[in-house]
A protein has these predicted regions:
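A short, structured surface patch at a secondary-structure boundary
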Residues: 26-80, 84-96, 230, 239
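Short secondary-structure boundary segments
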Residues: 31, 89-90, 112, 166, ...
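A ligand-binding cleft/hinge motif common to bilobed small-molecule-binding domains
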Residues: 93-102, 216-234
Length: 288
């Protein structure tokens, strides 16, 4: 019930931000998925600055960067003269956000969306906040339909055990436990988290990875590049003895697409589902 109330409040906040016909003209977006959503809704030309996590699309990556989303400076944001700041809930520090609001700039905070329902609520909320409510509703509906079509194509039963690695190669690999975006995507794709007993992201010993016995290992393209490629990752202690390593079942995805629960949610889910269920007949996805 509390989660549902939070989602309803989120939508109400964005809906009440601007009077009809007064869409913002200078927007600062803080958070990769938020930025991507604004661009997907056709308002990229109004974005004047972003944070370091906003790497897609290319036009967003070319805009002025305001630092890391949790370590912002109010002066940098205000120097861009925004009339709206769209930010994830973890944007901060709180003093910087308060200073931006005190300067008369509207700030909309958007909760992290680790699941389909909150992701669609966030897309609609972004659309309402930037004066594109109809476009936001249409995009959310399209993504919801695409995810439903993917789910319909998944084979029943036999969920593969999936280990998601957020980092590897420097110390013990960091794996995704429960309550993470990675676990939510694994579940949507018809898989089972191999380390579901963990909470959030935790370092795993070699023994723990062997005990997890994943059928598939999933990571990000940045992590795979950082460790030196597929062969090196699969040869890491603990990983090398897993069923996934033995079968060579390793897949890497763009981090924002896979974990951001933004406009590319269905596209990323489609790719993950194909990895987990090679024989499944899945629909063709639109690229965003």
């Amino acid at each position: 019930m509390m989660r549902r109330r939070g989602l309803m409040a989120l939508g109400a906040l964005a809906l009440g931000l601007h009077p009809a016909g007064a869409a913002p003209r200078r927007i600062v977006t803080l958070g990769g998925a938020v930025t991507e959503t604004v661009f997907a809704l056709g308002a990229g030309a109004e974005v004047v600055g972003t944070d370091l996590t906003s790497r897609f699309p290319e036009a967003a990556a070319a805009l002025p960067r305001l630092g890391y989303v949790r370590q912002l400076g109010a002066e940098g944001v205000l120097s861009l003269r925004p009339d709206l700041v769209l930010a994830t809930a973890d944007a901060g520090p709180p003093a910087a956000i308060a200073q931006i609001e005190a300067a008369g700039v509207a700030v909309v905070r958007l909760e992290e969306a680790h699941g389909l329902a909150p992701a669609l609520v966030r897309i609609r909320a972004v659309g309402a906040a930037i004066g594109r409510a109809e476009a936001g509703a249409a995009l959310a509906a399209a993504i919801g339909a695409e995810v439903a079509a993917i789910a319909a194509g998944l084979p029943p039963g036999g969920a593969p055990r999936v280990l998601f690695l957020l980092s590897a190669g420097r110390g013990a690999p960091m794996a995704a436990g429960s309550g993470t975006a990675a676990e939510a995507m694994i579940s949507l794709a018809g898989g089972r988290n191999a380390v579901e007993g963990l909470r959030q992201y935790r370092a795993l010993s070699a023994e723990a990875m062997l005990a997890a016995a994943p059928d598939v290992i999933v990571t990000t393209t940045d992590t795979l590049e950082g460790v030196g490629g597929r062969r090196r990752l699969l040869a890491l202690a603990g990983i090398d003895g897993t069923p996934a390593a033995g079968a060579g079942r390793l897949a890497a995805f763009d981090a924002l697409a896979l974990l951001g629960f933004g406009p590319r949610l269905a596209e990323a889910l489609h790719g993950l589902a194909r990895v987990l269920h090679p024989g499944a007949v899945l629909p063709v996805m639109a690229r965003r």
